[in-house]
Amino acid sequence: MSVRESFNPESYELDKNFRLTRFTELKGTGCKVPQDVLQKLLESLQENHYQEDEQFLGAVMPRLGIGMDTCVIPLRHGGLSLVQTTDYIYPIVDDPYMMGRIACANVLSDLYAMGVTECDNMLMLLGVSNKLTEKERDKVMPLVIQGFKDASEEAGTSVTGGQTVINPWIVLGGVATTVCQPNEFIMPDNAVPGDVLVLTKPLGTQVAVAVHQWLDIPEKWNKIKLVVTQEDVELAYQEAMLNMARLNRTAAGLMHTFNAHAATDITGFGILGHAQNLARQQRTEVSFVIHNLPVLAKMAAVSKACGNMFGLMHGTCPETSGGLLICLPREQAARFCAEIKSPKYGEGHQAWIIGIVEKGNRTARIIDKPRIIEVAPQVATQNVNTTPGATS
């Protein structure tokens, strides 16, 4: 089967050169404030963080707040917890419908990193660029909203409200909320020495979308055309788009099946940044060591040809709606990786063992010469509808 036709601006009576990504100067989750700056900015919110919780709950219920992507707040009644997250990104692909799906998947991913599989409600946050013409706005933004809505329904939830504003750049995001019993989520702080690290989506999305834009910029394309073909770039771009739009819900469910000890999702801080943040949260004195980097095919070579300007080999390259990084018992990890590929979960799910958890000081690192796992594109075997009403 072949991939369905991608977004064509002329099909919507727009100029053939219309590009959604031109309505922002940053891409995807590359908008994040650096981690060290963020921690300093949030210090005042962390003061007396647990006092109220301890007053009425005796600190019995688990709680998670400032410093992680999801908050877990014990409710006053019934032994339940509110699990909530918010996120937003800028356009990273030019297909408005797929961009809506990616934005929704990106919001939900923080819940999935907690092992939460059911979302009770979503809000959508939308910034409509004041640089869009009325025609562009009226053609493009409904596609974005439809993509967001369809992804939320795939996740078993719905969008019941939100906020829409005029903004210089297009902004896409939302809020995901659920109420859980203690056995319905997994706190991200129980990694132990001997665990292994599993990743559920390949790295390199930022590289793929960047070099796809370089196809129209000769001075940039000429720097990399000796290491990658136009077909390679097109396949990597399609694969990146499908991976970003794929929900991490299956992986979240399997975290319970295979006794996951901790997890986070990989987004704007890159795999190393998010691994470091997760390591800091651990109750046991451990460190994470990453030996393998699964990367979209040809994107490692592109990164090296660019002088590693993307930071891909160093683990600092931002990802958008990336996979889950999961700490699993060694004896369970291989079974997790095999199970997630089962056809019963649909096409496209993958996982790799990429490192280990060892005794340490709550840090994370990538070894000097990590093994690069070239992840071949699966788009040629998938029948994916990237635009409402498109036909194969």
From Swiss-Prot:
It comes from the Eukaryota. It is found in: Cell membrane; Nucleus membrane. The keyword Membrane applies. InterPro entries: PurM-like_C_dom (IPR010918), PurM-like_C_sf (IPR036676), PurM-like_N (IPR016188), PurM-like_N_sf (IPR036921), SPS/SelD (IPR004536). The active site is at residue 31. Its EC number is 2.7.9.3. ATP binds at residues 32, 67-69, 87, 110, 161-164. GO terms for molecular function: ATP binding; metal ion binding; protein heterodimerization activity; protein homodimerization activity; selenide, water dikinase activity. The modification Phosphothreonine is found at residue 387. GO terms for biological process: selenocysteine biosynthetic process. The record marks 32 as: Important for catalytic activity. Keywords: ATP-binding, Cell membrane, Kinase, Magnesium, Membrane, Metal-binding, Nucleotide-binding, Nucleus, Phosphoprotein, Selenium, Transferase. It is an enzyme of class 2 (transferase). It catalyses: hydrogenselenide + ATP + H2O = selenophosphate + AMP + phosphate + 2 H(+). Gene3D superfamilies: PurM-like C-terminal domain, PurM-like, N-terminal domain. GO terms for cellular component: cytoplasm; nuclear membrane; plasma membrane. Binds 1 Mg(2+) ion per monomer. It is a peripheral membrane protein. Mg(2+) binds at residues 69, 110, 265. Homodimer. Synthesizes selenophosphate from selenide and ATP. Belongs to the selenophosphate synthase 1 family. Class II subfamily. PANTHER family: SELENIDE, WATER DIKINASE, SELENIDE, WATER DIKINASE 1. This is Selenide, water dikinase 1. The lineage of its organism: Eukaryota, Metazoa, Chordata, Craniata, Vertebrata. The gene is sephs1.
